C-alpha cells in the first residue's frame, strides 16, 4: 500500500486553483433578456491576463454570509428559500489564480478574506458608482440608493480591501455586459467583498480520468478537474461508460 501511495504522490500533482471574486447585487430586470428562457446562466469574459466567470446567479434572491474554514464571505441564496423574492439579482464574478501548492493557494486567499473580516463576520459593500469614481461608500451615500442591500455589511472602498485584479476584472466584465444587454448597468449596483471558492489540487490524469497508477481513477472534484455537482456526476458517467467497454 505504501508503494502505491508513493507512486501516486510522486509527480502526480500539478497546480492548485483558487477563485476569488466580488459578489454583485443589481436590478433583476436588467438581465431578463438573458434569463427569459432559463433560471440562471454562466457568463464568461476572456481577457489577455485573466478569465472572469459568473457563479451562483440568483434572480430575485438574497445575499447571505457563508462561513467556511474560519472565513466569512458573501454568498447567494435562492429566493425560494425565503418564500418571497426581491427586486434584485446577485452573482459572484470569480477570477481564478493558480499556485504550485495547496498551501500557497490557501494562504493567498485566506489572507485577503481575513483582512476583510477583521476577526469578525465583516463584509465590505460599495456602490458601483463609488467604485468607478474611486471613493468610499458611506452610510449617508446609501440613504438614497435605489438598490437596497439584502445583507448588512460595512460600507467602504474595495480599492483598499482587495487586490486590483478583481476590481479591474469586474470593470472589464461589466463593460462587456453592458454591450451585450445594450443598456448601462445601474450605478446603484452594490458590490460585496469578497467571495471565494477553494479546490483540491489538480492531479495528473489521462483523458479517461486514470492516474499514473494503472487502474486508479479519480472521479469528481477530488481530481481537481471538475468543479460542481453536475460536472462531478458527468465525470462519473463518463468513466463508468469507459470502464464498461474495456
Predicted segments with their positions:
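Residues forming the flavin
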Residues: 1-246
